[in-house]
Amino acid sequence: MINLFYEESYWFGTNRMTGPRAVVRNLLDSLHDQKIPYAINEEKYEHNFIVQYDRNGYIKHSNLTLENCVIGPQIWFFDEHVKELQQNSERYKSIIVPSQWTKDLAINKFGFERVETWPVGIPLPEIKRDDDVHQFDCIIYSKRRSVQELNDVVDLLNKKNMSFRTLVYGNYNQEDLALMCSRAKFCFLLNGTESQGIAVQEIMSHNVPIFSWDVSEWNDM
């Protein structure tokens, strides 16, 4: 039994998929699957899970039983209200982050205590992929990379006479992703730094081979 705190205003009025929306969607699906009771934006049960620690999450946090609060994974370490947690570790039970590298960052760069990794679950695809039937060659998945880099990928595929479809982060819905994964031979991943990489893991869950043009640094620092 758990209390969840988040704001649907992050994605209200659109069916486009983003990381924050996917975290909440997959979390709720997991709780339903395991038949775990939960409340949303009220302290009904003993344990508090502040999924989105934005300004609204900070205000909600101040009115909760602090020692029962787990905070994350949607927490931006540069926010002023987040910095207060660095000097007041008694205000939370644990900070959770979606991967080992973000845990190392939270501890070594920002000085947080009691940090745990918690990657959200990835649902199995409802549309089954047939490796013998493809309608096009490649999905280009683009997130936080330059227009020039995207154009370079397009030029490369065109030179090889490969057909493709493009998914740009924030401009597609879940049905788009699932349908393309069921019809493509492979994915060209043109991605920035990821904390967990939910969309990437969803593509992998469809058994789609991924070619990744990697990055070696986090440009937000």
Model-inferred region functions:
Residues 179-184:
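Short alpha-helical donor nucleotide-sugar binding micro-motif in glycosyltransferases
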Residues 192:
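Aromatic "clamp/platform" in nucleotide-sugar-dependent glycosyltransferases that forms part
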Residues 84-93:
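A conserved, positively charged/aromatic
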Residues 1-61:
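N-terminal pre-catalytic "stem/leader" segment of glycosyltransferase-like enzymes
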